[in-house]
Amino acid sequence: MAPDLNSLPRSEAPSSAFNPEQKPNILYIMADQLAAPQLKMYNPDSQIKTPNLDRLAASSVQFDSAYCPSPLCAPSRMSMISGLLPMKIGSYDNASQINSEVPTYAHYLRSKGYHTALAGKMHFVGDQLHGYEQRLTTDIYPGDFGWVVNWDEPDTRLEWYHNASSILQAGVCGRSNQLDYDEEVMYRSTQYLWDHVREGPDKRPFALTVSLTHPHDPYTITKKYWNLYEDVDIELPKVRIAKEKQDSHSKRLLKVCDLWDLDITDEQIKKAKRAYYGSVSYVDDCIGKLLETLEDAGLMDNTIVIFSGDHGDMLGERGLWYKMSYFESSVRVPMLVHYPKWFAPRRVKQNVSTLDLLPTICDLIGTKPAPFLPMDGVSMMPHLLGREGGDTVFAEYTGEGTVRPMMMIRRGAWKYITCPADEPQLFNLDKDPLELDNLARVAKVEPQTEYEREAKAAFEGFEAEAKAKWDFDAITEKVLQSQRSRRLVWDALSKGTFTSWDHNPEDDGRLKYIRSNIPLDDLERRARYPFVDSQGYEISKTVNTTRG
């Protein structure tokens, strides 16, 4: 017999205010490629204008050291929804398919009576729902095996890899693929919220994930947002490292992204960053619109708002662009949890991960992850309540630019990076926030200072921990086998009649607006909010059901 998730141990209510039996709604907003160090809520000197996000942060629990589980879209997202590190679920790159038997936060929410919906990007391959009851849009990226990394030919640049075009062609646009997509995401999301509030009195609480594709490159944005930075002298990267002096992984990234032989001018950097800044301001307006809709629909006081992202963007720092590395601008993400009636606004300094969202959401709704299944994520509930919580983050990466598995451990002030193909790295981010002093150098010499002795002890501890945690040879074989198998399947499926795996959302126009089989006056009254009676007087009773 299948286990009843409602019979799992409940989270203990740690305070009189916290009461998961209330089943508040949940709105989870994601931005794509949004670098936390670039935002004003983390960097007071930031040039990016984000008034809505700043207001939200001021009344939220703000995590100052949040990280993604992998600095690439799909692996990061698959780990985020499952609470499991990428290697445990086979999420090796942007064309990896995770098994449908892996529970996600959407499954736990549905089991507790929530209506789970997704609007926007999630980068699913194969199964396009993974526990969501409803997808309001298709995805912006392919849901198949077309983007498989090839470690068998590490020096070959594949057609779909990042390249310099996003930088060289940066600037103003009237419209773009990204804008087309996010405009649909926003329309569907706000419509969903209005549909919810117009449902009958027995409606379920909602858990809506809104996943925007901005500010992901290409670096283009409309004139409205470009002009926000007309009088701003866009800052140039703080750290510049000659390509010959880069670490080995960064050298591979420059080649993978076709940037090795390119000298990007300061003017080109400023144009790309200005467009990125404008795209972040666009995301900020989207956040404002969602929050405004919650307010107007009377949902704000009963909705937990979570905001985060899948990874960051280097934006020219160290000469690097996009993501795919463990430097701060690539791997650190924003994280906010807003629900003032339970959680007083505060800042959390400890290290957390989007991997921790699943067990945290379980705590928020009064359940626990299944004890008979593995779980890498750690609930952030202690942090939300102002108590001592976790301070360790693990991350795994086997996507573009790698030739062997590349792992990270973040704990306290330390960041440790290891890969069998590269030299190890160790940074103390309290003393070296720009990550310029690789303290792994002390492992081969006699420490001369107390700081070096501390660094050597930390390095040796991390080396032993990594060796115990990861079997790099076994992981390499699994990744290679998966890559080869998926390439074989994709090659076969590309021949003959092509059948798409991409999601096609249902949208039956025959059931919307004015139709002959629906009494006109009744329809108009039920579609209006707030509700009114036949004489136009506002009534509080909900009378409509618009979503199955």
Regions found by a protein language model. Give the residues of each.
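Formylglycine-dependent sulfatase
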Residues: 1-419, 424, 433-457, 496-548
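A contiguous, mid-protein "functional segment" used to position or interact
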Residues: 443-498
